[in-house]
A protein has these predicted regions:
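Active-site loop segments of alpha/beta catalytic cores
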Residues: 1-33, 85, 94, 98, ...
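Secondary-structure transition motif
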Residues: 12, 43, 47-49, 70-75
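Segments that shape or occlude catalytic/ligand-binding pockets
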Residues: 23, 27-64
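A contiguous, low-structure linker/loop signature
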Residues: 57-120, 139-140
């Protein structure tokens, strides 16, 4: 599928499952781990982080995030029981429902702060150690992810301030992006050299109806640097693919992403774009990943709705290969378990010989 050849069956992924969803599935399957759930569902991908150490940050850590919010189980610098700081100095607050995080502050909100700021000191494991860990997943597609610099930048600066700077202070944006892209390129190349199958570049640049900023700004700030990142990954390991993730309607930059060398596009959010039309337009140039609605069908639809969407998506996006089916993003924690099971059962049982 990744090489645009018709596979013997449809590849499956289960992107960013929430803790509550995994717990419900473990109970359903009587599985003792998330890995057991993935095997029961027939998932072909394994998202495996590169376990980096941030020495200066680690000296300040004073607690572990508990509960069900993203990042639960990780260590942070807590300002109060619900507010914490990560290794980049970005401050988040656990929402009132305990399920989601809210951005609160970043270290570059002050004027001229960039002059005194540098990326965090990081120590990665030896490449041999990373490669040995991947050996346990030889029968799966292995993925590690990096944060897209736009996402990191607005978390550091504040969204409104950073969007304004893209127009009013492009020199600052260039300087910040040089630092962020260099940091993420180093990690990406390490992952490729260690043997990861896919490097996922993750960060939203669009809302429901349009881009968060002009495609011309993406062309100016991101295209040269993203092209370099992808090229360095390919030099390190020609077999490694690069996936780009952005929710929302980001169709305006798809041609730019293709020119950058992106191999896989996720999630083709069906509430914002037409997956069949995107396949028809770009299917010879990109592999598509995702497309199953976590805004509507999975949380709110019937089992039949889920079955119909999965079948339609396979028929309209899965022809000629180049398609990996997955939820578009994390499935909401209160989505019916039957719908989650139906998604993967329908995909597994689809008769691919009909193509």
């Amino acid at each position: 599928a990744l090489n645009h050849q018709l596979p013997d069956r449809l590849p499956l992924d289960f992107i960013w499952p929430r803790r509550e969803t995994l717990q419900a599935l473990q109970l359903h399957f009587q599985a003792d781990s998330a890995e057991g759930v993935f095997r029961e569902l027939g998932i072909d991908f394994r998202w495996i982080p590169i376990l980096a150490c941030y020495p200066k940050f680690q000296m300040r850590v004073n607690g572990r995030l508990e509960g069900d919010a993203p990042g639960a189980g990780n260590e942070y610098v807590f300002h109060d029981p619900r507010t914490f700081e990560d290794q980049w100095g970005i401050v988040f607050r656990v929402g009132a429902d305990g399920k989601y995080l809210e951005w609160k502050d970043g270290p570059l909100r002050r004027e001229h702060a960039l002059e005194d700021w540098s990326v965090p000191e990081v120590v990665y494991p030896p490449i041999e150690q990373i490669s040995r860990r991947l050996e346990s997943y030889q029968n799966y597609v292995t993925v590690t992810e990096i944060e897209f610099p736009f996402k990191l930048a607005w978390h550091l600066c504040g969204l409104e301030d950073f969007l304004m700077s893209m127009v009013s202070n492009p020199g600052m944006v260039e300087a910040l992006y040089d630092k962020l892209y260099a940091f993420q390129t180093e990690k990406s190349v390490l992952g490729a050299r260690a043997g990861y199958d896919v490097i996922a570049v993750v960060g939203d640049v669009a809302g429901q109806t349009s881009m968060m900023f002009s495609p011309d700004l993406f062309e100016r700030f991101d295209v040269p640097r993203l092209t370099s990142l992808v090229a360095q990954v390919k030099r390190a390991n020609p077999e490694t693919k690069v996936l780009y993730h952005s929710d929302g309607n980001m169709e305006a930059i798809i041609p730019s992403l293709i020119r950058c060398g992106i191999d896989i596009l996720n999630p083709i959010q069906s509430a914002c774009m037409d997956p069949a039309a995107i396949k028809a337009r770009y299917g010879d140039l990109l592999t598509f990943h995702g497309t199953i609605s976590v805004q509507d069908t999975i949380p709110n639809g019937t089992v039949e709705d889920v079955r119909d969407e999965v079948t339609t998506r396979i028929k309209t996006v899965g022809y000629n290969g180049g398609f990996i089916i997955s939820p578009e993003n994390s499935i909401p924690y209160d989505a019916p378990l039957e719908n989650v099971l139906t998604l993967f059962k329908t995909a597994r049982e689809f008769d691919y010989s009909s193509f």
